[in-house]
Amino acid sequence: MSRVNPADLNLTDRVVHISRVAKVVKGGRRFSFSALIVVGDGCGYVGYGLGKANEVPEAIRKGVEQAKKNLIKVPVNQNQTIPFEIEGKFGAGRLLMKPASAGTGVIAGGAARAIFEAAGINNILSKCLGSNNPHNVVKAAFAGLQRLKSPEELAARRGITE
């Protein structure tokens, strides 16, 4: 898979989850933050990143930088949905994604909704099965979306021409 140049895309970023973590040291607790970020151009390109820092804005900035390095292309058809049903898995998290007819909207939970909207998928049905941890849901969604191929790609792979 070829690497995508983020400078060529008009990317918008979205914070999926921010968590405060504590490291217990001799003098007490030292707090830092981790931010899970999703970036996308609304036309099929989407990526996610995890940034960690002592301050929230710095964690978000680091997450955006990492997300720009993890961009993938998602095949979106003319109904602004995915071509076929697929399930993504990561750890204990599973995300079932089904194509929806035009006008349905994004039927998804928080973490999955952010990904679909960033990718420009406006009609989709999804269900989180197993873990609802935002990290697992995001990674499961990406695992499923990476496996998606457009109908043209599948036809070419199978040697079918119309």
From Swiss-Prot:
InterPro entries to which the protein is assigned, alphabetical: Ribosomal_Su5_D2-typ_SF (IPR020568), Ribosomal_uS5 (IPR000851), Ribosomal_uS5_bac-type (IPR005712), Ribosomal_uS5_C (IPR005324), Ribosomal_uS5_N (IPR013810), Ribosomal_uS5_N_CS (IPR018192), Ribsml_uS5_D2-typ_fold_subgr (IPR014721)
Keyword terms of this UniProt record: Ribonucleoprotein, Ribosomal protein, RNA-binding, rRNA-binding
Molecular function terms, GO-annotated: rRNA binding; structural constituent of ribosome
GO biological process, alphabetically ordered: translation
Keyword Ribonucleoprotein: yes
Gene3D superfamilies, alphabetized: 3.30.160.20, 3.30.230.10
One annotated Gene Ontology cellular component of this protein: small ribosomal subunit
Cross-referenced SUPFAM superfamilies: dsRNA-binding domain-like (SSF54768), Ribosomal protein S5 domain 2-like (SSF54211)
Pfam families, per the entry: Ribosomal_S5, Ribosomal_S5_C
Top-level taxon in the UniProt lineage: Bacteria
Subunit-structure text: Part of the 30S ribosomal subunit. Contacts proteins S4 and S8.
Record text about domains: The N-terminal domain interacts with the head of the 30S subunit; the C-terminal domain interacts with the body and contacts protein S4. The interaction surface between S4 and S5 is involved in control of translational fidelity.
The protein, known as: Small ribosomal subunit protein uS5
Organism: Pelobacter propionicus (strain DSM 2379 / NBRC 103807 / OttBd1)
UniProt gene name: rpsE
